[in-house]
Amino acid sequence: MHEPRKLYVKSFGCQMNVYDSHRMADTLAREGFVETQDPAEADLVILNTCHIREKAAEKVYSELGRLRKQKQEAGSDTMIAVAGCVAQAEGAEIMRRAPVVDLVVGPQSYHRLPELLAEAKAGKRVVDTEFPAEDKFDHLPAPTRAATRSRGPAAFVTVQEGCDKFCTFCVVPYTRGAEVSRPVAKIMDEAARLVDQGVREISLIGQNVNAFHGAGPDGTTWSLARLMEHMARLDGLARLRYTTSHPRDMDDDLIAAHRDLPQLMPYLHLPVQSGSDRILAAMNRKHGRDDFFAIIEKMRQARPDMALSSDFIVGFPGESEKDFEDTLDLVRRVGFASAYSFKYSPRPGTPAADHDAQVPEEVKAERLAELQRLLEASKAAFDESCRGRTFDILLEKPGRQAGQLIGRSPYLQSVVVNDPPAAIGDLLTVTITDVGPNSLAGVPAEASEPSVSQSPVSSARSRPLAAMEA
């Protein structure tokens, strides 16, 4: 009996890459591959890449250099594939820079992996970055029950890909293509299958998810709000989320869904990028700061317990001190529970990359640090406001200590619970007793509170809140 071939997949970047990595693994499982967590023992390594910032792309080449050295030292014949947005953007250039790569495959061709691998194994240098007309989702197999259970009780479902917004800093329209929405029936089939396999929480994902306009089973075009209303009726589905959204597509129906659907979590990730109207216009965001404030006000009226997350770019070409102060002002006024902040990174082929007024790196670094301090304080204040409150926590995985389980709050916070009277996949009502820099701790709502000295998070080391260049 032959040993099964081993597959190692490493995902960089967004949730959609995680979803795509799972689907690639499901596809290759049919070819006899089993996943491993050790690239050294893999017969095939896939790097599923992100191209949104220069540092993210360069991480891929660093990883390829490490894999090349590993192959040479071990004398192995491991095949190496580069997938994702770097593959789409750079194509054959990847093989020129890193000859160790056997296969380059773009996001729309994952269903062709078995035949592409066969070509690569036969000695061909394979690059497939086409945007085929057929729906790749029609050709990707569903995960097995065992695969779904191994990934935990929370799952992603892609409902939309691509973006038509063409923000001047962004490569997504070029690497993922135009906006395409999946048919409602296919989405519902996938969601129902996941719930049947034990999933309790589904996050609907897309590059611009709230632009969803899928063909409904009744012959009409469905919005994201209507899709979620339908999905919320699935027996056994406890939670719904969606990401990533664009302010231009936050309509009243979607806001009302947060009011009307108890399964829809009171947490919204809504990237604003800048608090300056001048910079927002230069970014081609097609909304202003007052538009953003109006959305937040409506959202909080519809769902008073709503918490917000966002993305920010500092040092966009032409950003003045006044523009940056406008961003700080927006952060103070909104009060974010979490946020991601980045230095502007010029991406080849985007309009902003050719802008004359590039901001010096040292200025970008100073502004990022200042913004990060403010966002960190905002996050800490929100986390502290959760102390003493009671939430339903979805238990997702074991903790580091015996008897611990770790779950997620409605606000995506990691919550540690000692010896819970529940199992992974259960929703447990928990009272938050302690707040650490990276997680919360709690006890079952009917239990007594532990002392601070017993807290599993009280001594945790702090880390910056997603302060990134990549």
Curated annotation (Swiss-Prot):
Function: Catalyzes the methylthiolation of N6-(dimethylallyl)adenosine (i(6)A), leading to the formation of 2-methylthio-N6-(dimethylallyl)adenosine (ms(2)i(6)A) at position 37 in tRNAs that read codons beginning with uridine.
Pfam families: Radical_SAM, TRAM, UPF0004
Signal peptide as annotated in the record: none
EC number: 2.8.4.3
UniProt source species: Xanthobacter autotrophicus (strain ATCC BAA-1158 / Py2)
Protein name as annotated: tRNA-2-methylthio-N(6)-dimethylallyladenosine synthase
UniProt keyword Disulfide bond, yes or no: no
InterPro entries, sorted: Elp3/MiaA/NifB-like_rSAM, Methylthiotransferase, Methylthiotransferase_CS, Methylthiotransferase_N, Methylthiotransferase_N_sf, MiaB_methiolase, rSAM, rSAM_horseshoe
Phylogenetic classification of the source organism: Bacteria, Pseudomonadati, Pseudomonadota, Alphaproteobacteria, Hyphomicrobiales
Binding residues annotated for [4Fe-4S] cluster 1, in chain numbering: C14, C50, C85
Gene assigned in the entry: miaB
Family: Belongs to the methylthiotransferase family. MiaB subfamily.
Domain MTTase N-terminal: 5-122
PANTHER family found in the cross-reference section: CDK5 REGULATORY SUBUNIT-ASSOCIATED PROTEIN 1, MITOCHONDRIAL TRNA METHYLTHIOTRANSFERASE CDK5RAP1
Record's subcellular location: Cytoplasm
GO molecular function, one term: N6-isopentenyladenosine methylthiotransferase activity
